[in-house]
Amino acid sequence: MKICIISNLYPPSERGGAELVAQRVADELSSRGHDVFIITTMPFAGIKSLCPKVTEHYVERVYRFFPLNLYHLFNAHRFPHFLRLIWHVIDLFGPFPKSVIKRVLKDEEPDVVFTHNLKGLGMSSAFQIQKMGIRHIHTIHDVQLSVPSGILVCDQHKNREQISLVRRLYEKATKYAIGSPDVVISPSNFLAEFYQSRNFFPNSEIRVIPNPTPKYVSREERGTVSPSGPIKYLFVGQIEDHKGIGVLLKAVNNLSFPFELHIAGDGTSVQSVVKKAKLDSRIIFHGFISLEHIRKLMRNCDCVVLPSMCYENSPTVIYESFQVGTAVIASKIGGIPELVIDGENGLLVEPGNISELSEALSKFEKEREVFWNKSKEIQKSAERFSLKKYVDELEKIVASIK
């Protein structure tokens, strides 16, 4: 079967978990004998970058092109809001990306197209796929079809954001652009219900399938003896205010026992973290690191902390943490409570509540040995999120579409 995967970003140009999911699925499908190719974006690099070309040819072929807009998605934070507004309009209605994708699809003639995040690649590309009559499966990863930034902090969707005229107009445009794929996959019940409540995908079948863990599973044990020394907390992800990094740094200031806070990632708030790490030896900043390095940190740290302030879908870092047997302290928001069970594989706290997060960090320190003893149990629980099972489901879904 020839399969096309379309994603606004694709490794090594990744910003979040959606791109990693797309790559893992591509690799697994290829290993099963399917002919897989990718369509994704690249920053502007002269006139030639407007034409799609295969820039990598590993197991899968990767077509990259610049989707003719004011700037590339990666550079959005550098531009003022009025230019971002124009950028969003072009992304929604610009004909160029749609024509490029149409040309590639006509040349390749895939049996099915899997789409992931499309913002920055041309949102109406989805409508083009459906117009061509190709089987179409779309995976939603965040709220970007409802909120341009893809970020909805705490209770925004219950108050002023709910009645925003701009947001309503934006939703109307994205509903038209995304259309109704044959099947829409949501990694969490939260996100599926979020979009259904806002009348997206009226003619699509909605399926909830949690994200897959990486195919590689380390055989290295976390340890069978009781941990000693300062407790080690780990934050992995985008270093942004909406990810709760500021809340976490304030929360650890309230701790009265020895600890280490390891931070790995990159983002617009990285300089404040670097400054904090220079002033406090208990805070260790690793920067943007490889997945293998992340796994090593997860194995060696006592727990992963995910203090997000925004409505998360189904964070990849939780799956990866469970896969190595490490518990998670996380915000009780979005789809996180569907993965983290309070007291079993981690602890849940109210988002943005500094004192509650401090209490959870302290509680974990007291129950440190208890959670280490649960490592194998936590690791085993991650087996239901295996990449093999995930792709098995995808193949069944494709076969069911007439």
Walk through the language-model features, giving the residues of each.
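Short alpha-helical donor nucleotide-sugar binding micro-motif in glycosyltransferases
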Residues: F288-I289, K296-C301
